Amino acid sequence: MPVHLRNSRLRRTLLAALIAASVAAPVSGASSPAAVPAPVPAPLAPLRDADRGTLDARYAATRDGILAAGRMAARHGDRKRAAALRGMAEPRRHFLLFDGRDGGRTAEVFGDLTRAERIAVLVPGADTNLDRYWRLRNDSAALRRELGPGAAVVAWLGYKTPATVSPAALTTGRADTAAPGLTRFTDELHTARPAARISLLCHSYGSVVCARAAPGLRAVAALVLYASPGTGAHDVSALHTRATVWAGRGTADWVADVPHTRLRLPFVSIGFGPDPVSPGFGARAFDAGTGGHSDYLKPGSRSLKNIARIVSGTAPSGRSRHA
């Protein structure tokens, strides 16, 4: 098919997706997690050290905030949210950040941050919030087990993720808002653990967040883009990062069928441009196996093993199916 016809078809597809999302969004948002009230969290000082006393104090402060949010959710009549928050407040769980408002913002630590030589920060994509947090938690725990001793994983839900079917999922708006917070968070981790190797693992729309933050990520060694619809950048050089950029996609991931183009409208651009696993993008490709969109950190999967190898600073095994 001639290039101009193919591009025209991609533009029509994006416009159709935007119209469909605009119609569906009011329906899908009717029982939004953001509707559950929560108290304003107590201010926290920037993390400057990862010694046991500092971290224990931080974990205790966020636990108090979680319990307060749970009580407010119970008074609101949301028993499911209240129960979930009681579970998050258990002493065995450790949060560097917590804000229960507007769907939730959290940063949960898996592993011992005081001794971590490798730190992986998971940046999730669409439809991740306090009511659907279990998947991010399970993925983080699986990666921590795969990495073994000397590693910590942080599940960073530091922004309001878009709904999968919504206009916000087709633009960089939410990512632009999230990027400064991600930059500050990685800077704090580096200050607290200056010798640790930090990697960002960016799933789906999370890869757009990582891309928008990339120029300011001074302390990050690796950016891993997986299940990515694109980044909003035309290639790796446009990310303006010193980090090594990796990209992988499972063979059963539906995101492969997303139009990899960007359509500029008068007041907004929709779509995220070139496919990060394409050779022309310039990322280092890794074999992400045969899984689907939510399977990358599934225990025993090739994608989990290769992502863990990248976090550890070693080369992934196998040959990318998109090379």
What are these regions (language model features)?
Residues 95, 204-205, 220, 227:
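Mixed-charge, polar/low-complexity N-terminal
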Residues 31-35, 113, 126-129, 134-141, ...:
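Lipolytic serine-hydrolase domain surface
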Residues 118-120, 197-199, 222:
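Structural motif
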Residues 211-215:
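Short, hydrophobic alpha-helix immediately C-terminal to the catalytic nucleophile
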Residues 122-123, 201, 248:
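Short hydrophobic segments within beta-strands
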Residues 1-135, 310-323:
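Flexible, membrane-associating and regulatory peripheral segments of lipid-active enzymes
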Residues 61, 97-100, 207, 288, ...:
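Intrinsically disordered, low-complexity regions enriched in small/polar residues
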Residues 201-210:
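Gly/Ala-rich beta-loop-alpha elbow adjacent to hydrolase catalytic centers
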